[in-house]
Amino acid sequence: LSNTRGIGAARRWIKKEFEKISKDCGGCLEVKEQWTLVKGNPKSRIKKDTWIVNIYAIKRGTKYPNRYVIMIGDIDSRISDPLDGEGDSPGANDNATGMAGALELARVLSKYDFPTSILLAGLSGEEQGLYGGKFLAEKAKIEGWKIAGILNNDMIGNIEGVDGVIDNRTFRIFSEPYSILETEKQLKQKRFYGGENDGESRQLARHVFASTKTYLPEMNPLLIYRLDRFGRGGHHRPFNEVGFPGIRIMEAHENYNRQHQDIRTENGIDYGDVISGVNFEYCAKLTAVNAAALATLALAPAKPKNVKIGGIVQPSTILSWEKVD
């Protein structure tokens, strides 16, 4: 494998960067690789046996070491043909921006201790079928991780929409209303005692909105009440599908001339996901959005247990719950 080109070179470089950050903080980060073999299938985007490799770093929590808040970016990219594994596919915005954000937060947050563990990840195989997220979510489920939230950052660097709109303050937060694993009884309870905005992923999205308004008031977060864009997918979805709360954070205005395109110029229009299409100040702002959300979640206590609601025929609602450590 090349040390300068392709996803193998990218993941090795990312691992080295995590290791450098860990060295600077006295070994405070646990840097890990997750290798999973995907068998080739002529009907899928992976035609031959392929290793999917995730790279991640953990800043272990001082009080809740098995409780996690997670930020993820992707380390794979694609061009016009999703099966083209040879053509140049820089993926500067989709999704080097999300991965750069995860690396920067590893550097910044490693300087502090938190009660809850913080995990920063670079996941592979997103464009081929959300494989990296699927494998890390399965690992978390099998090992019994307690996950407070997954922040999937997928494209956080573009401010110029294909419609010509330029906006360096607005971003979108996608979230599903409730877990697909909820039972009929749980859904009935939600109908009578809550609503779709009380689902865990929706609550997580609202927390990101609130922390943004507190610490970055100049930013304009948009709560989008859907799992993702119409017909599209992201690496938060595999976590949702096994019951973990997860959301997608991304730019507000997409530019399809720069997304999933061969690098070329046609009729005076430049195509391709190259670095000139990334606004670094905007990327830094959305990285700060993640910093605020991760830090506040990691400093918070565990969620309360045995929550009960009362107050029928009374002027005020009465809430009760078990004391949190």
Where in this protein do the model-derived segments appear?
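Second-shell loop/turn segments in exported
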Residues: 1-8, 40-46, 83-95, 108, ...
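Proline-enriched interdomain boundary motifs that mark the N-terminal boundary
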Residues: 300-310
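A non-catalytic alpha/beta surface segment that caps or lines the substrate-entry region
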Residues: 1-60
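Active-site-adjacent mobile loop/cap segments within catalytic or ligand-binding domains
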Residues: 156-174, 223-299
